[in-house]
């Protein structure tokens, strides 16, 4: 079974959360397949009602969608209800509302790699909260709508153009022009 991630730039989030959960809980292949189906459903909802593109919605759309997908998948894997999976997805997405997409030198490396790590932790935390009975008072579909509205409102410079945010810091500009002394990875 193949479950597509939200985007290449956020592609490590869902798999990291699902694999960490599967390895620590000794879950089987069938459980992982169900989790991927759940993740895919969340991704389809976000993609059809908003966007998963950093160029259109910022990193909140890319990493937020991937974290929401991962959170719902982990909730499914650990026996949570569909309602709990939606709460987990909503919480994961809410945690990154407003996050810009500001790739240094226009490459999907800095800060993307670290955002994948924090996105995986966001997914696991949100699943844990939902499984503990914590609910998102803002329903998932409304969180998705809010993310889309925020994405349209943020400046184009922080929507995958490498013209704002970390991309235009002095170090970001040095990296863009190939003057890197000790690359961060």
Predicted regions and their residues:
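Conserved phosphate/anionic-ligand binding catalytic regions in large, soluble enzymes, centered on
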Residues: 1-17, 61-66
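Glycine/charged-rich beta-loop-alpha catalytic/anionic-binding loops adjacent to active sites
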Residues: 1-3, 46-56, 103-108
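An acidic intrinsically disordered interaction segment
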Residues: 22-42, 87-91, 167-170, 184-185
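Alpha-helix capping and helix-loop boundary segments enriched in small/acidic/polar residues
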Residues: 5-8, 30, 54-62, 110-114, ...
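Acidic-glycine-rich active-site phosphate/pyrophosphate-binding loop
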Residues: 31-51, 95-103
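Alpha-helical support elements that line or immediately flank enzyme active sites
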Residues: 15-26, 71-79
